[in-house]
A protein has these predicted regions:
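HIT superfamily nucleotide-processing domains
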Residues: 1-140
Length: 140
């Protein structure tokens, strides 16, 4: 299913021009117009899924295969020192377009970008309570 009001659906299906790095029947990989670093790309499924919670597991698995293939090519061809694979879900998590997508962000020494978080500290009791809450009523 596609969403006719979704800009990423339009880009993924070729209705809006993009600088395409890879395409198959399910995905289009494009260069990000506001790149974090040189070679920053986006993996877009051609079908509309708002986020990770909507995309079928097999489609998500194939998206990661595309990430490996294209990410390897980006790192090798551009001489990057590493690669961040980023997938945000929800506005508070940094998702700006409600269409599942994966960022491939090549990393270079001293590129000035930081994908970090401040480590927290929880007691053993808090960790156990959180684990129990997540696992409650879970089928084996």
């Amino acid at each position: 299913m596609r969403d006719d009001n979704c800009i990423f659906c339009k880009i993924a299906n070729g209705e809006i021009p993009s600088r395409t790095l890879y395409e198959d029947e399910e995905f289009r990989v494009i260069m990000d117009l506001g790149p974090a670093t040189r070679g920053h790309a986006l993996i877009l499924p051609k079908e509309h899924y708002a986020n990770l919670f909507e995309i079928p597991a097999d489609t998500a698995a194939r998206a990661m295969q595309v990430a490996k293939k294209v990410g390897t090519q980006i790192v090798e061809k551009l001489g990057a020192n590493g690669l961040n694979v980023v997938q945000n879900n929800g506005e508070c998590a940094g998702q700006t377009v409600p269409h599942f997508h994966i960022h491939l962000i090549p990393r270079y020494q001293d590129d000035g970008q930081h994908i970090l978080w401040k480590p927290g500290k929880l007691s053993d009791e808090e960790m156990d309570a959180i684990r129990d809450q997540i696992l409650a009523d879970q089928e084996s």
